[in-house]
């Protein structure tokens, strides 16, 4: 008797959907049958385009991830497909290894979303799956006859090669005399980062390791984490603090004063350090990046790494040094790039380590804050309102589409006035004074995201706080 009679029906009945990047849902809905259904459908879609006999598999530190991985591995075995399990590693480490081995991969991770949720990310042998692949996975009708959940034996190869990818770029330990704090919490890469930075010459201080899962969101850094960073920087005399989200594909980096950098500013500095010609970024990124001051071409996309990756195809026709990054800090290398006469192969998926290393390399004879202060002054801020369903978020955006004045009044900005809107992803409103407010539904969880941009940080923060406070008050009426 089949455990999964029809993978399409099992997935549909689970209520789990593809979000901004990967399939996301409640842990209780990711049953072994649902994990198996996603796995066999993914394999079927990949077999239409690629020849392979093995799939790579890895997990983050969420308590539910190992059991989900066991179900995925069991489904692969049922289909006669081998599995290499790389244990707990950052998502980009799995992606790099699987691309090097020309095989598909599955990452069990919920990234930064709340504890009670989890997810599955899928990789083709040539990188992240596309939105077209996602649709194909949801339409496949396949079966799984037997699921035997076995202990998974860990291979260290992905972790070793991920560290080597970056240490091989530098012939000298350029971080000598630098003190780097690693905010470890429950990050999937927490056991890799210390040896990586030590190999580059740094004195490393381990900070904030947690036995419980901590869903760090690099676009909505908590007040507690801001205070921690400032305290650590002072107590340990740090030159920088490095951290990531849960699965290690979004960086969180603080300067010598413990001030966390915005992800898009980090991406800009990394792109400049790499001497990039063309850049693909979501529309939510700081507008100074697309101002024409830094790059030959900037392509604006919807929010989500699949859209950034899709833009690489267009950019590669005219440019040879291509990168992409997001407001969350995740950095995507769209082409091979030579660094210190060493070739760094393209890695078209979000990565947290490359932007950190290039920022530290660029600031090796100065400070991180000095590099940031050289940029034009334009500030962004973002936060989220949790527990807001996608339907409710979309109804807010529809309100703005039908009558912008009504939306501005609803979010407490009725006296601001708007001069333009952009509907590329959600609703991005340019106000009369040139400030920007951007609302969109999260693709990963029932959350409403709010982004703001202004010439003063306090102004950007006030716009986000006012907007979300008014929405929260009205939604709870």
Curated annotation (Swiss-Prot):
It catalyses: alpha-D-mannose 1-phosphate = D-mannose 6-phosphate. Binds 1 Mg(2+) ion per subunit. One of its GO terms (biological process) is GDP-mannose biosynthetic process. GO terms for molecular function: magnesium ion binding; phosphoglucosamine mutase activity; phosphomannomutase activity. PANTHER family: PHOSPHOGLUCOMUTASE (ALPHA-D-GLUCOSE-1,6-BISPHOSPHATE-DEPENDENT) (PTHR42946:SF1), PHOSPHOHEXOSE MUTASE (PTHR42946). It is a multi-pass membrane protein. SUPFAM superfamilies: Phosphoglucomutase, C-terminal domain, Phosphoglucomutase, first 3 domains. Its EC number is 5.4.2.8. Mg(2+) binds at residues 111, 245, 247, 249. It is found in: Cell membrane. PROSITE patterns: PGM_PMM. The keyword Transferase does not apply. This is Phosphomannomutase. Involved in GDP-mannose biosynthesis which serves as the activated sugar nucleotide precursor for mannose residues in cell surface polysaccharides. This enzyme participates in synthesis of the LPS group B O antigen. The keyword Cytoplasm does not apply. Pfam families: PGM_PMM_I, PGM_PMM_II. One of its GO terms (cellular component) is plasma membrane. Belongs to the phosphohexose mutase family. Keywords: Cell membrane, Isomerase, Lipopolysaccharide biosynthesis, Magnesium, Membrane, Metal-binding, Phosphoprotein, Transmembrane, Transmembrane helix. Pathway: Nucleotide-sugar biosynthesis; GDP-alpha-D-mannose biosynthesis; alpha-D-mannose 1-phosphate from D-fructose 6-phosphate: step 2/2; Bacterial outer membrane biogenesis; LPS O-antigen biosynthesis. The active site is at residue 111. It is an enzyme of class 5 (isomerase).
